[in-house]
């Protein structure tokens, strides 16, 4: 199948498929005489794998490692689990950071009258003149 058909079958844009080819993540099964990329079911499954992994927030390097493990039928599942648990710990840390930011912004917003007066604790905090609430 051509790149457009592979895109439709996998749900991955043609632009991203070309990018994944460039970085060596997924190679076309073959090339036509006119040098067009051709894909088969294996690459479509790999593209779906990548799309799902990206949707879970894995970085390209992690996806490359996961793909190599997926392709290796003799892989130890503990290695896959370790990658997933590291990623989960990173996600938990980012969520905690974002929650702290949201809590701070919520407190600052609660302190702002939001009326016609010019004084605003949000702007004061952003300039560093006000200690974070």
Question: Where are the language model's segments positioned?
Answer:
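Arg/Lys-rich, alpha-helical DNA-contact motif
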Residues: 2-8, 27-33, 41-133
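Glycine-centered, phosphate/nucleic-acid-interacting loop/turn motifs that mediate DNA/RNA or nucleotide
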Residues: 24
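Append "Primarily bacterial transcriptional regulators
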Residues: 6-7, 17-20, 39
């Amino acid at each position: 199948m051509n790149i457009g058909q592979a895109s439709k079958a996998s749900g991955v844009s043609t632009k991203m498929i070309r990018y994944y080819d460039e970085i060596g993540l997924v190679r076309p099964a073959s090339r036509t005489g006119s040098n067009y990329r051709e894909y088969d079911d294996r690459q479509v499954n790999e593209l779906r794998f990548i799309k799902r992994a990206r949707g879970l927030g894995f970085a390209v390097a992690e996806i490359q490692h996961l793909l190599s493990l997926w392709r290796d039928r003799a892989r130890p599942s503990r290695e896959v689990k370790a990658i997933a648990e590291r990623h989960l710990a990173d996600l938990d840390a980012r969520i905690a950071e974002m929650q702290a930011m949201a809590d701070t912004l919520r407190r600052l917003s609660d302190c702002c009258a939001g009326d016609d007066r010019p004084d605003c604790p949000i702007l004061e905090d952003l300039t560093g003149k006000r200690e974070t609430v």
